[in-house]
A protein has these predicted regions:
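Extracellular/periplasmic helix-loop-helix junction of adjacent transmembrane segments
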Residues: 18-47
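Cytoplasmic helix-loop-helix junction between adjacent transmembrane helices
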Residues: 91-132
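Helix-loop-helix hairpin linking two adjacent transmembrane segments in secondary transporters
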Residues: 87, 116, 121-172, 176, ...
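C-terminal transmembrane helical hairpin of 12-TM major facilitator-type secondary transporters
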Residues: 266-314
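Helix-breaking motifs and short loop linkers at transmembrane-helix boundaries and internal kinks
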Residues: 28, 60, 81-87, 98, ...
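Juxtamembrane intracellular "pre-TM" segments in multi-pass secondary transporters
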Residues: 175-205
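Paired small-residue
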Residues: 71-78, 86-94, 294-300
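Conserved MFS/SLC helix-loop-helix module at the cytosolic interface between two early adjacent transmembrane helices
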Residues: 46-86
Length: 390
């Protein structure tokens, strides 16, 4: 499960060190337009999830997952040979469409087998492995461009997709039995979509996750510009980025150890408050124009630690009341959080002004809005130990 989830992180973060080379080769004149390499992928990734759940509920998890991995691998090959910016955008959208299945199906497979705190614990363990991908991906990209053309990054992604396809075909059993499959019919699908979009807890945590992810995507969109152009840290960019990302993995590991005892709400609500305090302080430092590289790295690492505690639990809480329509619910939530997060992140990225202010302020605002969504979901009460009727 974790390796499948890593296909997404690899397709994003391995690009970071090669952005200048990709931009030059494809004739991208405006530096900020390079962000479309990420955004095009994320839009395909998010939009495709709206159909994956319905297909998975009808045909089973395994078949649909195999189809998605095939599209991912084929699109990676297309990107390897793209000769224009437009061709790259098409390949990246298709790559995202293929990878969308890995997000929906992994969550649905876990939900088929677990629920509640046990689901959160399993997701946290998967996130530990998953989060090693953004730690290693920039270094993989950097290593490739040191010895070969940037196109070999996409060749690596194609190989990863093929290996994942073979492993799933060989080792993964079907988790949705025939008697539990839902036919493709307008009535049941509309009912499942309506339930996914009207459950207070599910919608509240889905929207909260959307804004938290939006802040993260804003950071990823501008990471290369921040470290290289603002802090002049080109030589140490991948190392610092990996260290920051490692704090997400550390948080997910910690979450897997404490969530069973403390509960999802206590852990994630405390982490969200910490997220807001840290990002607000970071924004104040950025506004003072006295920020140094080490300050940025420390504050960003603390932010990512809180993000790691929030992410696994918010996703699990959004899915928990919708187990009987897990495939469709996972699709709806994946579509909203990814497409919404991508657009928020693109908005933050396009406001890059040569300082860290847009990035840090974007994180703080997204955190505050996420808190508002949680308060709506929980009817104004935080840290509740058990789920109440909604």
């Amino acid at each position: 499960m974790a390796a499948l989830m890593a296909t997404n992180a690899l397709a994003i973060d391995s690009m970071l060190p090669a952005l200048p080379e990709i931009g030059e080769a494809l004739g991208i004149a405006v530096v900020s337009d390079r962000q479309w390499i990420f955004t095009a992928y994320l839009l395909g990734f998010g939009a495709s999830q709206i159909v994956y759940g319905t297909l998975a509920d009808r045909f089973g998890r395994r078949t649909v997952l195999l189809a998605g991995l095939f599209v991912y691998a084929a699109a990676s090959v297309m990107a390897t040979f793209a000769g224009t910016f437009q061709a790259m955008m098409i390949a990246r959208v298709l790559q995202g469409i293929g990878a969308g299945g890995t997000r929906v199906l992994t969550v649905s497979i876990v939900r088929d087998c677990y629920s509640g705190r046990q689901m959160a614990r399993v997701m946290s363990l998967a996130m530990i492995v998953f989060l090693t991908a953004p730690i290693l991906a920039p270094s993989i990209g950097q290593l490739i461009v040191l010895f070969a053309d940037w196109r070999w990054i996409f060749a690596f992604l194609a190989l990863f997709g093929i290996v994942a396809l073979v492993v799933v075909a060989w080792r993964l059993p079907e988790t949705l039995h025939e008697e539990n499959r839902v036919p493709i019919a307008v009535g049941p699908i509309a009912h499942a979509f309506a339930e996914s979009l009207t459950n207070r807890l599910a919608v509240g945590y889905m929207l909260a996750m959307t804004f938290i992810i939006g802040g993260l995507f804003g950071f990823i969109n501008t990471a290369q510009q921040l470290f290289v152009d603002v802090f002049k840290a080109e030589a140490t960019f991948t190392v610092i980025f990996a260290a920051i990302a490692a704090f997400m993995g550390l948080a997910s590991f910690l979450n897997s150890r404490i969530v069973g005892r403390l509960g999802m709400r206590r852990v994630s609500h405390a982490a969200l408050i910490g997220f807001i305090v840290i990002t607000t302080a970071h924004a104040a430092i950025a506004f003072s124009m006295t920020e140094r590289l080490w300050i940025f790295a420390v504050m960003q690492a603390a932010t990512m630690f809180c993000f790691g505690l929030v992410a696994s639990n918010f996703g699990a809480m959004a899915m928990d009341p919708l187990g009987h329509v897990a495939g469709t619910a996972s699709s709806v939530q994946g579509f909203v959080s990814t497409v919404g997060g991508a657009l928020i992140g693109f908005f933050i990225g396009q406001h890059f002004d040569g300082t860290s202010v847009p990035n840090t302020l974007g994180f703080a605002v997204c955190g505050l809005i996420a808190l508002a969504m949680v308060l709506v979901a929980e009817r104004g009460r935080l840290f509740r130990p058990h789920q109440q009727p909604v």
